[in-house]
């Protein structure tokens, strides 16, 4: 009976060995300056393109007004759609929960997927939908923006921009966690500064 009680559990013993080995592998990866800065360049580049796509439509207001027939209210609605779901549907709150539960890899892929889908919808709206098509019997009264019978391209572009905004803002939170994970104990403040500076280039 004593022999059975003192017999080691091979399964639990192997698990104990695997855990330290995994921790050592991760520690070595983050200790490599090349890998740290490579990871930083990837996430910084992602945020740079996200900011670029967010702001690229601002100088095109006159072109959108002339080419698509959008008025000032429609353009204002489109511009504000970026943060619409994040503010009113609390998407960043739920995104933070997803990040804590699922980790940076899953959340990072989710952010990229949302940005690609949103950008594709927005591109389709401004390039393929008939500029003369309008949505009849549609009325929107949102704070100072009032829209009656808006252009179809405007509503679809706003939807795409909202989806893109969810991915872009959640990506900002994810990038902060990625940097803190890779650079804690190293050049954390420098990495944060480089990321912000690179992102603002967009």
Report each predicted region and the residues it spans:
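Glycine-rich segments within core transmembrane alpha-helices of 12-TM secondary carriers
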Residues: 189-202
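Small-residue-rich segments within alpha-helical transmembrane domains of MFS-like 12-TM solute carriers
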Residues: 51, 55, 149, 153, ...
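Extracytoplasmic
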Residues: 38-72
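Intracellular juxtamembrane helix-capping segments at the cytosolic ends
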Residues: 170-183
């Amino acid at each position: 009976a004593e022999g059975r009680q003192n017999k080691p559990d091979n399964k639990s013993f192997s698990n104990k060995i695997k855990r330290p080995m995994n921790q050592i592998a991760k520690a070595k990866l983050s200790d490599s300056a090349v890998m740290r800065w490579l990871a930083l360049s990837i996430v910084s580049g992602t945020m740079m393109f996200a900011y670029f796509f967010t702001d690229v439509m601002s100088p095109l207001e006159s072109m959108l007004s002339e080419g698509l027939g959008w008025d000032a209210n429609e353009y204002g609605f489109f511009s504000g759609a970026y943060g619409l779901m994040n503010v009113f549907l609390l998407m960043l709150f739920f995104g933070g929960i997803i990040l804590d539960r699922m980790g940076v890899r899953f959340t990072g892929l989710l952010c990229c997927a949302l940005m690609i889908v949103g950008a594709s919808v927005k591109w389709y709206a401004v390039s393929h939908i008939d500029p003369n098509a309008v949505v009849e019997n549609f009325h929107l009264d949102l704070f100072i923006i009032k829209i009656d019978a808006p252009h179809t391209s405007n509503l679809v572009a706003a939807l795409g921009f909202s989806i893109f905004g969810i991915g872009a803002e959640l990506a900002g939170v994810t990038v902060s966690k990625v940097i803190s994970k890779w650079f804690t104990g190293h050049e954390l403040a420098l990495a944060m500064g480089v990321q912000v500076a690179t992102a603002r280039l967009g």
